[in-house]
Amino acid sequence: MPEEGSGCSVRRRPYGCVLRAALVPLVAGLVICLVVCIQRFAQAQQQLPLESLGWDVAELQLNHTGPQQDPRLYWQGGPALGRSFLHGPELDKGQLRIHRDGIYMVHIQVTLAICSSTTASRHHPTTLAVGICSPASRSISLLRLSFHQGCTIASQRLTPLARGDTLCTNLTGTLLPSRNTDETFFGVQWVRP
């Protein structure tokens, strides 16, 4: 008859089976908790508003122009208007007010209504200016553009803006801006502190 085993008995720890039986579900539970936490964190990040991520941004469309004596352009923004939005900055009587210090990209495009290259040169000088109009202590011109012989001008620049700065846009001359949102728009984007 063949011999079974070596004849030496190996003592097993009585809690070994219990330890194995408890360890497997514990590790599995930790892995499941980790996966669930990562998924919830990713969902929370996707649902954060742009302001909390550090993105102050606005894209505005022309609302209306003031009286003939007032060269100021008034803007509007919001999701009900289509591609127009405000995240961070706000509108104050049609002018854009900044809520966070930093370097911003300011951009604008204005197309003159009922314009051809010959009418643009006849009504020279028609000028568009963008500047900080309030507070008065920080009043400064940021962009000044002439239409010369064209009907559309567009420009952008990086500039430092401070909390409370209000940006104003002025159109001097006899021609009016187009209300078409593809032709006339104004916006800012926070770039860095």
Swiss-Prot record:
Q: What is this protein called?
A: CD70 antigen
Domain THD: residue ranges: 56-191
Pathology noted in the record is: Lymphoproliferative syndrome 3: An autosomal recessive, early-onset immunologic disorder characterized by increased susceptibility to Epstein-Barr virus infection in B cells, abnormal B-cell proliferation and increased susceptibility to B-cell malignancies, including Hodgkin lymphoma. Patients usually have lymphadenopathy and hypogammaglobulinemia, and may suffer from recurrent infections.
Output the Gene Ontology cellular-component terms: extracellular exosome; plasma membrane
Classify the main location: membrane
Question: How does the record classify its membrane topology?
Answer: Single-pass type II membrane protein
* UniProt subunit comment: Homotrimer.
The cross-references to PROSITE patterns, in alphabetical order and at most eight, read: THD_1, THD_2
Function per UniProt:
Expressed at the plasma membrane of B cells, it is the ligand of the CD27 receptor which is specifically expressed at the surface of T cells. The CD70-CD27 signaling pathway mediates antigen-specific T cell activation and expansion which in turn provides immune surveillance of B cells.
- How changing C115A affects the protein? No effect on protein expression but loss of CD27 binding
Glycosylated residues in this chain: N63, N170
Spell out the InterPro entries in the cross-references. Answer: CD70, TNF_CS, TNF_dom, Tumour_necrosis_fac-like_dom
Into which family does the record put it?
Answer: Belongs to the tumor necrosis factor family.
Q: Where in the cell is it found?
A: Cell membrane
Alphabetized, the UniProt keywords read: Cell membrane, Disease variant, Disulfide bond, Glycoprotein, Membrane, Signal-anchor, Transmembrane, Transmembrane helix
Listed result of changing P135A:
Decreased protein expression
Cysteine disulfide links: C115-C151, C133-C168
According to the record, mutating R83 to A/E/K results in:
Loss of CD27 binding
Q: Tell me a GO biological process for this protein.
A: B cell proliferation
The UniProt GO MF terms for this protein read: receptor ligand activity; tumor necrosis factor receptor binding
Q: Which Pfam families match?
A: TNF
Listed result of changing C168A? Loss of protein expression
Record's comment on post-translational modification? N-glycosylated.
Q: Does the keyword Membrane apply?
A: yes
